[in-house]
UniProtKB/Swiss-Prot annotation:
Domain TrmE-type G residue range list: 215-371
Amino acids binding GTP: 225-230, 244-250, 269-272
Keyword tRNA processing belongs to the record: yes
Enzyme class: hydrolase
Family matches, as PROSITE patterns: G_TRME (PS51709)
Source organism (scientific name): Rickettsia massiliae (strain Mtu5)
Protein name per the record: tRNA modification GTPase MnmE
Textual note on the cofactor: Binds 1 potassium ion per subunit.
Lineage: Bacteria, Pseudomonadati, Pseudomonadota, Alphaproteobacteria, Rickettsiales
Residues reported to bind K(+): 225, 244, 246, 249
Name of the gene this protein is made from: mnmE
Amino acid sequence: METIFAQSSAFGKAGVAVFRISGPKSLEVLQLLTGRKDFKSRLMYYQQITVPETKELIDNVMVVYFKSPGSFTGEDVVEIHTHGSKAISIILTNALLNIAGIRLAEAGEFTKRAFLNNKFDLTAAEGIADLINAETIMQHKQAIRQANGKLEELYNNWRSQLLKIISLLEAYIDFPDEDIPDTVLNEVTNTHTILVNTISEYLNDNRKGELLRSGLKLAIIGPPNVGKSSLLNFLMQRDIAIVSNIAGTTRDIIEGHLDIGGYPIILQDTAGIGEESSDIIEQEGIKRAINSAKTADIKIIMFDAEKLDSSINEDIINLIDENTITIINKIDLIEASKIFSIENKYKCLRVSVKNNIALSSILKNIENIAENMAGFTETPYITNQRHRNYLQQALSHLTAFSLDNDLVLATEDIRMTARCIGAIMGVINVEEILGEIFKNFCIGK
């Protein structure tokens, strides 16, 4: 196995930069950089490092050596903590590249080696990637649970039950003339039924884990000049949309990313949906607005308190569902009695975006819907499509199983189910999917 290295911290100015080296030559490389031979595993040393050929001083650093297998990758590993200087990073990188037998790591290669050395399964490796990319508290909770083996524990439990069924059935394949005892038949049938129901229910999760991982899309919908862009700017706490009293100012979809209650929200401000426009660009904006609303996880539909009759049109009303927040904006400009019937009919919140009236209620409603759509349960969620695909295949094989069929074929259905579950964790030969998973890691991880 080659020795690899990379800067694990972000490149640029910082208090500290961390370089990681993994492989059989790790300790030798550290000795070349420091001129010291007596490093002990798991002790931090304050050292000077130099360019091996010229002995030019690179930096005063902290170094630590982890002897195999007691390291992240399971190999000999060295970490070098330098000052976070671009110049130091460049000089040290060049010095390492000039040492024979060491090369720059590929994206995700350290984690890939850890997986190949049985430090964790594939679901945990994916959890580490999600942990690095997590931007909100809820994304962190989901990722840390997966990185710490909760998904592996769940899938391992299912796989163990499947292997138990296989072992019970295979004992009778070589003796076709013998009847399978009722106790064995009952155990196989009961376990099979429980697994079918459990995996079916698990797949019927409304993609909560994937929503939390990628972010919930929230579309702000309404007629022209109702205050959608002003609401977007309030939610983002900065101006990212042009605010104007001219109808049709927003002609395309404007996006912003937000953390509400720990949930990742992707905000979309859309073009106003109103009367038929003769402007081709505006027509396209309206078409995109309706499509955006139809694919959004959460919708905010805004009505104009001064123009309720024109605000409420069929295109907008048809978009209302259980995950829609309806609001009447500009309530400061009209008497409350004039909006009472509409407020009750569509369960609207009364707000004024311009004067910051009741806007906290919008945030609370967004958080409540997000929690309902992607809130936590005791059972860890499916977090990406790869898992879902294998689980659907597993369920297909599992439902095809029948003891009325040939025993060999019935056992093969269970074996294929176990293989699909195993593929999620990487306990079978999955070389073809490793590249796809680890290419999404950053260099140095």
